[in-house]
Amino acid sequence: FCNETLRPEFYVGEWNYEKCRKHSIFMSQGYNSIKGMHYMLEALNIIKRFYPDVKLYVTGTSPLSRNWIEKQKRPVYVNYLEKLIRQYSLENSIVFLGSLNAEEMKEQYLLANVFASPSSIENSPNSVGEAMILGTPVVSSDVGGVKNMLTHNEEGFLYQHDAPYMLAFYVMELFENKEKCFEFSKNAKQHAKTTHDANQNLSALIDIYRSIAQKIER
C-alpha cells in the first residue's frame, strides 16, 4: 500500500484562524455531480439563515446565465445548480473562482474558515489531504477512503453524504467554535504530514515495484 503524495505547493504554508475569511467555505470543485455541489447548496441555504454573511468559494465558472442557447448546450447538472441557486436566493452568497493553479488553490484553502467536501463518491481525495496538511478545518462526507484519512471529531467532521442538514450543522459548529478549529487544524496537520510524507511514499512505491519484479522473475 502507498499513500498519496501531494503537489509540492501544499507542503508549504499554514492555515491561521486570525487571517481566514470568517464564515467562509471553500469547495475545490463542483460541476461533476458526484462532488455534491447540490448538497452544498442545500446546506448553504440552511447556514445562511443563521449566518447571513456566509460565503461559499468554489472553483469553476458561474452557472448563472440568461442565455437560453447556452443553457441548452451545457450539462443538465449545471442547469440544476443554477435552479437551486436561484430558488434559494444564493446569488450573492457564492463566489465562482474560475480555473485555479496549485498556488491559487492553496491560497483559497488558507483563506477559508472551513473546507467542505460533500462528495457522493470518493476514493482518498487529494483535496481533503491538501486541506489537512495546510491545517484548514475540514467537513467531509463519510464516503470511500475518507475515514482512513481523517478521524471524526478529532481531525475534522465526517457526516452522511446525502444529509445536507448535517453538513450545515458541522460547518456552523466550526463557525461558532474557534477552539474546535484550532484542535482540528493541529491534529489534521500532524496526521497529514505522516500520510503524505513524500519520502516515505516514494520508498513504499519502490518497495511495491521491487516486490512485483521479484514475483515476475520467479
Where are the language model's segments positioned?
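Conserved donor-binding/catalytic core segment of Leloir-type glycosyltransferases
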Residues: 16-35, 41-48, 56-59
